[in-house]
């Protein structure tokens, strides 16, 4: 025997209303703006409520409370005036039987007094989903007393077990077999998820389906001729750790075969790490080109871009831009060190070179002075050379110091400067003297 469907009675959390306008909005929502029929309680002979009388009915309900002050601001109201309940049936249930059973249940629980009191209520029967269900909006103010409707586990009549059992008995009379057992009786002890959690999971599932549809649409673009090129696996092999096919930067023959453009046909998500590997490899090749002084691979590729159909124009522009960026700064190998740095290095080399020259001249006075050669690198400048002419080195140093010095120096013929001659003249005339 298949398992019987469970009775579904749900008290909507936060479904109660506190103001007159909220009652109007709730009833208009249940009637789908007047498209569906709202039905009164058995006390009003089960007659339908016309859509144009919703405002009048809502005002009568707030007046029945006896405590509703229309001059009070709505944000200060705390008393809930209505309770929203949903009675749901399994999919495929007869709509007529479901409507009759749910209406009878609402009349017995809230209109007959069997539930501890008599209350006004309205119902709306919806069949917009697979499972038919009835919305019940109950006016919480008791008709023959001064109490308020309260459904709880401790209530003698209006508790959750009593609501399910009565619904199962009434449904059976209308040919609908339902089970009213509790979760503990069915061996289910885990706490169920709340309605808010269910709605949140439902929204997440819709979002995932939407993202999957976007991925399928983007993957379908691979059939376009623009994305039909075969991927170039050389950059992947090169970035995998210098295998046999890895082009070393110092090898010009192998380096010229490196493809610096991105392989076509890869998505943005999968190509993120590929782009990082390509950029790292590209920068390493350019750095090695600059240190070695040879033309970079990008210049070779850019020069043959018109002949090579595999390299797109955008790639040539990017690589050319890299070469221009690196070529703006002159290298020390071509230009040499700056003026101040060159003087400092030459000063370091003059001392030992002059002493060495004096020793050589004392030992062999006939030996001609050696030619002064310019050092080819910074290390050669700092290294002392005994074959260098001390007079030429000292003369060159004096010439450099003379150009860099700000104060005028005494000329080679020993004549004093104009300022010194004027000071000497004043001292001879007796106008000079010690200054105090």
Swiss-Prot record:
UniProt-listed InterPro entries: Endonuclease_MobA/VirD2, VirD2
Entry keyword annotation includes Cell membrane: no
Short name of one Pfam family: Relaxase
EC number: 3.1.-.-
GO molecular function: DNA endonuclease activity
Cited function: Tumor formation by A.tumefaciens involves the transfer and integration of a defined segment (T-DNA) of Ti plasmid DNA into the plant nuclear genome. The virD operon encodes a site-specific endonuclease that cleaves at a unique site within both 24 bp direct repeats flanking the T-DNA.
The protein, known as: T-DNA border endonuclease VirD2
Species per Swiss-Prot/TrEMBL record: Rhizobium rhizogenes
Lineage: Bacteria, Pseudomonadati, Pseudomonadota, Alphaproteobacteria, Hyphomicrobiales
Gene designation: virD2
């Amino acid at each position: 025997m298949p398992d019987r469907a469970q009775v579904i009675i749900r008290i909507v959390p936060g479904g109660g209303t506190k103001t007159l306008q909220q009652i109007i909005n709730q009833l208009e929502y249940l009637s789908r703006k007047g498209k569906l029929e709202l039905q009164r309680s058995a006390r009003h002979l089960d007659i339908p409520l016309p859509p144009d009388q919703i405002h009048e009915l809502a005002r009568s309900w707030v007046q029945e409370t006896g405590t509703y002050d229309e001059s009070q601001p709505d944000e200060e109201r705390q008393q809930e005036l209505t309770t929203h309940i949903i009675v749901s049936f399994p999919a495929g249930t007869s709509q007529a039987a479901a409507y009759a059973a749910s209406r009878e249940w609402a009349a017995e629980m809230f209109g007959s007094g069997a539930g501890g009191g008599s209350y006004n209520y309205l119902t709306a029967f919806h069949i917009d989903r697979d499972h038919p269900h009835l919305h019940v909006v109950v006016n919480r103010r008791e008709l023959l007393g001064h109490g308020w409707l309260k459904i709880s586990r401790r209530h003698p009549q209006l508790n959750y077990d009593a609501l399910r059992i009565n619904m199962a008995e009434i449904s059976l009379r209308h040919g609908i077999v339902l089970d009213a057992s509790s979760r503990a009786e069915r061996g289910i002890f885990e706490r169920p998820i709340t309605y808010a959690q269910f709605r949140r999971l439902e929204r997440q599932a819709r979002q995932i389906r939407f993202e999957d549809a976007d991925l399928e649409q983007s993957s379908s673009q691979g059939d376009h001729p623009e994305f039909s090129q075969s991927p170039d696996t050389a950059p992947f092999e090169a970035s995998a750790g210098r295998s046999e096919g890895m082009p070393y930067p110092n090898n010009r023959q192998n380096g010229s075969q490196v493809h610096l453009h991105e392989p076509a046909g890869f998505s943005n998500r999968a190509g993120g790490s590929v782009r990082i590997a390509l950029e790292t490899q590209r920068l390493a090749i350019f750095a090695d080109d600059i240190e070695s002084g040879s033309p970079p691979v990008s210049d070779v590729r850019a020069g043959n871009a018109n002949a090579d159909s595999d390299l797109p124009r955008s790639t040539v522009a990017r690589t050319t831009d890299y070469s221009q960026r690196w070529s703006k700064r002159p290298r020390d190998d071509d230009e040499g060190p700056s003026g101040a740095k060159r003087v400092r290095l030459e000063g370091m080399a003059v001392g030992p070179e002059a002493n060495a020259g004096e020793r050589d001249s004392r030992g062999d006075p006939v030996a001609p002075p050696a030619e002064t050669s310019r050092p080819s690198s910074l290390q050669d400048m700092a290294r002392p050379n005994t074959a260098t002419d001390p007079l030429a080195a000292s003369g060159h140093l004096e010439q450099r110091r003379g150009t860099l010095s700000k104060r005028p120096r005494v000329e080679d013929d020993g004549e004093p400067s104009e300022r010194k001659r004027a000071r000497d003249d004043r001292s001879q005339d007796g106008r000079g003297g010690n200054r105090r």
